[in-house]
Design a protein with these regions (language model features):
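Short Pro-Cys-Gly-centered "Cys-loop" motif that presents a nucleophilic cysteine in a tight turn
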Residues: 1-4, 8-9, 18-178
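Conserved active-site beta-strand element of glycosyltransferases/polysaccharide synthases
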Residues: 15
Length: 178
């Protein structure tokens, strides 16, 4: 059962309810089949997504909805869009815009029930996506370090663009940024 997803250019996030033993085989099959499809369609070869998959057991509902928020906000954090509903390769559109009517949806109806029990409306769940959350959702130390560096770089890139800074050396001399 798929609870949330977001497909980026070099990786994807997928929240699934699965038997742990079947998860590895499922992910191997998914990556392999998608690589064949993508490579045939675009005349490419090799892996489509970088690295192996990482999984984490979600035991608390509060952590689950925070992970969904993290997944949906991935393209916003990458500055691809300013709103989660503007990104076409995410379950956010299926959940919030009811795109299920237009095409066969892949989100489990179970997650919609869980969300309706936790939030009074989809608007409230949408607003929850805009609540700041600095949780990294990463369990592997090397990935946490890489994530921290990416967050710093992302912040600096945003700061440079926002303040129209042409020379990156200027930013390094700003005391409140260092």
């Amino acid at each position: 059962e798929i609870y949330a997803y977001c497909i980026m250019s070099n990786h994807f996030h997928l929240m699934v309810k699965s038997d742990f033993k079947m998860l590895s085989a499922f992910m191997r099959e998914l990556n392999s089949n998608y690589a064949v499809y993508y490579n045939c369609k675009y005349g490419e070869s090799g892996h489509v997504f970088q690295g192996r998959f990482y999984s984490s057991c979600i035991e608390k509902e509060s952590y689950m909805v925070s992970c969904i928020r993290y997944i949906h906000n991935n393209p916003v954090r990458a500055y691809l869009v300013s709103d989660i509903l503007s990104y076409p390769y995410s379950s956010a559109r299926e959940i919030f815009l009811n795109d299920r009517r237009k095409k066969r949806g892949c989100i489990s109806r179970d997650i919609l029930g869980i969300l309706s029990n936790r939030f009074t409306s989809l608007d409230q769940f949408y607003d929850f996506h805009n609540v700041f959350d600095n949780q990294g959702y990463i369990d592997i130390p090397e990935d946490k370090e890489r994530y921290d560096r990416e967050q710093i770089k992302s912040f600096l890139d945003h700061y440079i663009r926002k303040n129209n800074i042409k020379n990156e050396r200027i930013i390094l001399s700003a005391r409140h940024i260092r």
